[in-house]
């Protein structure tokens, strides 16, 4: 197989047409840009088939998209699937070298998750926060004991700063960032990411920030 890296995201569509990938890894914003680009061309050229337009934008071989670094909505995932592109979400961080979970493309019912935990990786939820223990977890931050103490508990669990939960099949779900929680006057914690994701599904909403 051949691995291609795009060092200039403004040229990603050019590189896709040049290298004709079968699998691509992008953040959700780029995936949304793909779908929007195809929708715009479809509207401008109603006489052209969706397959023809998709192949013009994304090449003839792309059939799988791996998303990370943010939430990939079910609506966006379905739009890509209608184009013949199966999606999957993964989760990781540099401190874990980097994988924590990987997508399972056979489980469409788990599309809202970020995949199942990788072998040897253990997760616990403390006050809503995802904490990880694995042989791949870092020993600490170089020459920064204070930051290391903040990131790794005394019993060796890495604090990710992300909120989420694990279901009974070891699929991991993300709810937002711990630092972003909004505490209401009644003491209830609200994750702005969950609100954003909910309204992002609405076709009348182009962009939203909470």
Can you describe what each PLM-predicted range is?
Residues 22-26, 34-108, 206:
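Gly/Ser/Thr-rich phosphate-binding loop
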Residues 9-10, 28-29, 70, 74, ...:
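Alpha-helix N-cap/helix-start capping motif
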Residues 3-5, 74-127, 136-140, 149-157:
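Conserved ATP-binding loop and adjacent catalytic segment of the adenylate-forming AMP-binding
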Residues 199-208:
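Short acidic amphipathic segments
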């Amino acid at each position: 197989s051949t691995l291609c890296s795009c060092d200039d995201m403004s040229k990603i569509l050019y590189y896709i047409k040049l290298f004709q990938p079968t699998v691509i890894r992008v953040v959700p914003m780029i995936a949304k840009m793909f779908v929007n680009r195809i929708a715009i061309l479809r509207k401008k050229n109603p006489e052209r088939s969706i397959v023809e337009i998709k192949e013009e934008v994304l090449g003839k071989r792309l059939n799988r998209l791996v998303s990370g670094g943010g939430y990939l909505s079910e609506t966006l995932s379905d739009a890509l699937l209608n184009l013949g592109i199966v999606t999957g979400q993964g989760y990781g961080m540099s401190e874990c070298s980097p994988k924590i979970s990987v997508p399972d493309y056979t489980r469409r019912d788990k599309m809202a998750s970020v995949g199942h935990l990788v072998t040897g990786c253990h997760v616990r939820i403390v006050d809503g926060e995802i904490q990880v223990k694995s042989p791949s977890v870092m020993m600490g931050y170089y020459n920064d004991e204070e930051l290391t103490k903040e990131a790794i508990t005394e019993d060796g669990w890495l604090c990710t700063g992300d909120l989420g939960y694990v279901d009974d099949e070891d699929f991991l779900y993300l709810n937002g960032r711990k630092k972003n929680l909004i505490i209401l006057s009644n003491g209830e914690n609200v994750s702005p990411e969950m609100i954003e994701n909910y309204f992002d599904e609405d076709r009348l909403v182009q962009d939203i920030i909470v």
